[in-house]
Each structure stands twice: as structure tokens, then as C-alpha cells.
Amino acid sequence: MSVLAQGTQVFMLAAGAIVRIPGATAFNPGGNPRDQVEETDLEDTTSRRYKKGLGTPGSASLTVNADPQEPAHVQLYEMANSKGEDKVKFFVGWSDGTEPPTVATQTVSLPTTRTWFEFEGYVSDFPMDFATNSLVSSQVTIQRSGDGKWTPKTPASGGGE
């Protein structure tokens, strides 16, 4: 069964609090392709041989309708332009649920009634796009650090067949 993108929400854990990032119009978490580690030896005469190596996290992109009155947007802009290299945890809640994540003593709990994708990274850019007859937008770039984690929604029990 497919899942609609409409209803997806993006959150971040910043300064010990869960922050919803409203106004998102697109999100791409980027990939984490594995490097190739060569294991070819001198006796190989026709082709190289490889093993799967470490992942190299790419950049995530989050497009938002930028709003200077929205604290989360200002916070993302400030993160992109700060001298610090603080990493932030991001949580993408799929449209198959509505409950937001919660946090207590820096531990985030993700409701099992919703599918989640989470990753860590730093905000590397918040460019603003001004065009005729459109809303001001920004394609926020987040440099991922480490693997992402996909947690499917837990099916409701008692459905029976």
C-alpha cells in the first residue's frame, strides 16, 4: 500500500526541545551510498573486485515557504549562518499518523502510530528564493552525518482476518 506525502511533518530536536518546521513543501533525506573498497590483487587480469565500504552521507534538502515570523525558519537560518558545527536530529513523520515526537531529558520518543525517518546533520545553507508571482521559499540544505533510520508504523492489533 502506498502512502501520501500530504500530511508529512518535519521536526528537529534543537536546544533540548522538539520543534516542528511548518511550511514544508518538499523534503528529500538524501542518500548514504556505500564507498567501494578495492580488493583486487595482482593475479586478477580481467576485472577489479570490490567490497562494500563505509557510507558517505549526502545532503538532505527541505524546501519551505520561508516566513520571517516563523521561529523555526529563523532558527534554521541562524543555524546555517552560525560559526558552530552543532549537529541537530531531524525527524520526518509520515502521513500515516499525526502524533508528534516527544522529548524528556534529551531522549526523543517517536510514537509507534506513525512511520518515521530520522537522521542527524547540520544546517549548511538557507538560501532565499524570490520570484515573480510566488511565495518566498528556501531550499534548506542539511549535511547528514551518519546513517538514517527508518521506523515503520506498528500495525494496529486486533484487526484479524
Positions of predicted regions on the chain:
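Soluble sensory domains of the PAS superfamily and closely related sensory modules
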Residues: M79-E85
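Short conserved beta-strand and strand-loop elements enriched in small hydrophobics
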Residues: M12, D86-S95, V108-L110
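Short beta-strand and beta-hairpin "edge-sheet" elements
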Residues: D96-W150
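Short, conserved charged micro-motifs
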Residues: Q69-L76
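Residue-level detector of buried hydrophobic side-chain packing
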Residues: L62, V88-F90, I142
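Intrinsically disordered, low-complexity terminal/linker regions enriched in Pro/Ser/Gly
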Residues: T154-E161
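Solvent-exposed edge beta-strands and adjacent loop segments
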Residues: M1-P68, E120-V136
